[in-house]
Amino acid sequence: MATIIQAKDLRAGHTFLYKGNIYQVIENSFNKTAMREGIVKCKVKNLRTGAITIEVLTGEKLEQAVIEKSKMTFSYDDGSGYVFMDNDTYEQISIPYSQLSWEKNFIEEGTEVSVMRYDGELMGVSLPDQLVVTIIEAEEAVQGNSVQNATKRAWLESKWEFQVPQFIKSGEKVIINPSNGQYVGRAK
């Protein structure tokens, strides 16, 4: 029996069925005004297409989607998608670029991910809360810039650009938060 959840109870990471699609909540907000039903706005990812949209769900009752997750490691890019290998069975699967629109910015060789499936259908991957990545290129630090928390631009192999502290150099490994793509700290 499918579990029904109220829209107001949705949180980041929850998955649900809505209008024939499977969505995963990225962010949500709930506004309750007097004499009215609460308004739930969710930034969601369509797990079939990879599209990210905003859905307004006021008083909706939604069917929770039960997603199966299995740990896999990124092996290589086959030209049409990314190939992941199950560490236990050595099974390999290819996931099209379209299903990894955001995640592809942070996946490097050897990255461990959770591959998501719904009723046997491949839905994409879920990244860990923090990832260790390699800086391919970083701008030079500006001499004399003593502003607290001064940053500069840096790039990953995927061409993802983000801000890092002035002391980070090309070739260094850093920790990022893949949910927003921001620098967290130096890798040890």
UniProtKB/Swiss-Prot annotation:
Keywords: Cytoplasm, Elongation factor, Protein biosynthesis. GO terms for biological process: peptide biosynthetic process. It is found in: Cytoplasm. Pathway: Protein biosynthesis; polypeptide chain elongation. InterPro entries: Elong-fact-P_C, NA-bd_OB-fold, Rib_uL2_dom2, Transl_elong_fac_P/YeiP, Transl_elong_KOW-like, Transl_elong_P/YeiP_cen, Transl_elongation_fac_P, Translation_prot_SH3-like_sf. Its main location: cytoplasm. One of its GO terms (molecular function) is translation elongation factor activity. CDD domains: S1_EF-P_repeat_1 (cd04470), S1_EF-P_repeat_2 (cd05794). It comes from the Bacteria. One of its GO terms (cellular component) is cytoplasm. Belongs to the elongation factor P family. NCBIfam families: efp (TIGR00038), PRK00529.1 (NF001810). Involved in peptide bond synthesis. Stimulates efficient translation and peptide-bond synthesis on native or reconstituted 70S ribosomes in vitro. Probably functions indirectly by altering the affinity of the ribosome for aminoacyl-tRNA, thus increasing their reactivity as acceptors for peptidyl transferase. This is Elongation factor P. The gene is efp.
